[in-house]
Amino acid sequence: MALAYDGAIQRLIDAFGRLPGIGPKGAQRIAFYMLSAPEDEARDLAEAIEEVKAKIRFCDICGNVCESSPCPVCADPRRDRSVICVVEEPKDVMSIERTREYHGLYHVLGGAINPMANVGPADLRIPGLLKRLEGDEVKEVIMALDPNIEGEATTSYLTQLLRPVGVKVTRLASGLPVGSDLEYADEITLGRALAGRREA
């Protein structure tokens, strides 16, 4: 029979165990670390979690996370407004920004088409993307979705949807492992994939 802890410690283990990428043993290690950590460190963590839940929202323009809308990327006049890079999640924006190779804007879909999880085009921020393409300022849309089945399905769907709009639609060059997530790609590989993008 598995050892279970009483009350607060088990609640903490269970809470950490619900986080992505944290298994039961990892959750237990983190919980016991927090138990022996200085009180101010535990308080800092709790306050940081509360603060992010209270202050962070999604940019009204691109869907990236921010404290005030528009986000710093959309508000930056130095960004190239003729290019929009479409990504699945805000974490993908961070991955691309780390490359220091991309200077355009972003559009965060909030996921990818996944029939197994009942996620269809209507569940994504596609109308916002189309609205941003209404003027003639945007010349290129880069599809930077995860190289997995869901990312490929979403890229294919959006490419067909955007062709009549008249913008150039490109996708990241090969080099990213199939079935992986953008957030796990190193900066050099991701930078080369951006630089070598090809017509979709």
UniProtKB/Swiss-Prot annotation:
Belongs to the RecR family. Residues 82-177 form the Toprim domain. InterPro entries: DNA_Rcmb_RecR (IPR000093), Rcmb_RecR (IPR023627), Rcmb_RecR_Znf (IPR015967), TOPRIM_dom (IPR006171), TOPRIM_RecR (IPR034137). GO terms for molecular function: DNA binding; zinc ion binding. This is Recombination protein RecR. Keywords: DNA damage, DNA recombination, DNA repair, Metal-binding, Zinc, Zinc-finger. It comes from the Bacteria. It comes from Bifidobacterium longum (strain NCC 2705). Gene3D superfamilies: 3.40.1360.10, 6.10.250.240, RecR Domain 1. One of its GO terms (biological process) is DNA recombination. Pfam families: RecR_C, RecR_HhH, RecR_ZnF, Toprim_4. The lineage of its organism: Bacteria, Bacillati, Actinomycetota, Actinomycetes, Bifidobacteriales.
